[in-house]
Amino acid sequence: MPIKTGRLLRISAAALALTSGAAAAAQSDLTVALQLEPPHLDPTSAAAGAIDSVLYSNVFEGLTRFASDGSIIPGLAKSWEISEDGTSYTFHLNAGVTFHDGTSMDAEDVKFSLDRARGEDSANAQKALFAGITDVSVVDPLTVKVSLEAANGSFLFNMAWGDAVIVAPETIENIKTNPVGTGAFQFSNWVQGDRIELTRNADYWGTPAALESATFKFISDPTAAFAAMMAEDVDAFVNFPAPENLPQFEADPRFQVIVGSTEGETILSTNNKMPPLDNVKVRKAIAHAIDRQAIIDGAMFGIGTPIGTHFAPHHPDYLDLTANSAYDPDLAKQLLAEAGFENGFETTLKLPPPSYARRGGEIIAAQLRAVGIQTEISNLEWAQWLEQVFRGKDYGLTIVSHTEPMDIGIYARPDYYFQYDNPAFQTLMTDLRSQSDPATRSAMLQKAQTIISEDYVNGFLFELAVPTVAN
């Protein structure tokens, strides 16, 4: 199921650059700035793309990984066999792989990692990726067999997620502050509120990193981000938070500006169980009250692509459904009146730190106010957002970019933070997993896109672009 996963924000441009010989030819160290600091350093127990931006592929690796064209290629597993009925996968691991603490990585570690991810007490934010696993058995030290309850055409894809990396049981107790993986870089230091430092893994089993060290610097304020780049305090800023400054960088021969697309569906996430947002007419009214292009222009200075469902526009199975939620404030007012809210209502709008959320939130609040919906805005730090919104579901509206690869399946999870419960959609997603025919899968994915678009589960805003400024 190849997609353009090389464009993922989760597989950050910074992460990819760290092992690039060309990128590092003139220097032995690199300082990359990011706006978001990870809440902790365990990618298997948090829904924070900020963790993967630093650690995925650099420190931690999975059985499979994404190639630059989005296809699935070997990772820690050098090869695999799939049973005729598609219900078992036998992975053959690379020999000589060690964790950064010097211990060997073997089939027992794979079993531990997958069993931990799928266990009843699992804190993995993407636990659904592992739900179909019925057994993980060690065949020999370099061979592991994974049995599934039913064929799953997405299984190898799922194993490439940052949530599916392989960890060692001996180091799991301190993983949130001292992560130990198998990657080309190993964790060195975390000065919270400032930076994370990685150093080259001299014993890496694969192609060695070109850099000796890499530092991820966290700069949340757009003004400070601009100042840091102009002073050349950092070598690159991935997802630069002040797009209004990009023309100035483009005109300066010291810098280059690279704008890439992502898998990041930026949405006005809606609590589907909180009245009156549990009323589809109210959600539809919100959708028609939003001028997406005005948000892209005002918050992102024109960088971004409007969407009408939770699917990346560059995906071959994408269906353009933006007309379903076209800007129409008069229709929004009519729908509110039909739902019994002629005079509008009040709700909360809780915003995480990214600029697209903070800036976009102010614009959306004004657009909703114009049709009678009053929002109480709260600006949250990332850890607060994860606790209150993602885990606690204590919100009415929020804005966030879902950067996981082709993650429309989250709408089949009633316990997910927007609490959408549609049995027909859940059945469709279950049936999709057992399908391998490309045409059939495409039709099912387009049907899924249509269902959530017409149910107005969330306000679908735009596909996040990633502007990177580098020296």
Where do the model's predicted regions map?
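Detector for C-terminal structural segments
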Residues: Q27, V191, A289-D317, S355-A365, ...
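N-terminal lobe/hinge region of extracytoplasmic solute-binding protein
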Residues: A33-E84, D115, V180-T182
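A structural "hinge/loop" feature
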Residues: E37-S53, L76-A77, T103, A125-Q126, ...
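Gly/Pro-rich hinge or "lid" segments in bacterial periplasmic/extracellular proteins
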Residues: S71, A151, F157-A209, S213, ...
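Aromatic- and charge-enriched surface segment that lines or borders ligand/interaction sites
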Residues: K78-A123, V139, K145, P276
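Surface-exposed binding/hinge segments that line
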Residues: H92, Q126-P169
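Ligand-site clamp/hinge motif
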Residues: E173, N201-P247, A365, Q374-E376
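Append "and occasionally in soluble cytosolic enzymes with long acidic Gly/Pro-rich linkers
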Residues: R200, A251, I258, L277-A366, ...
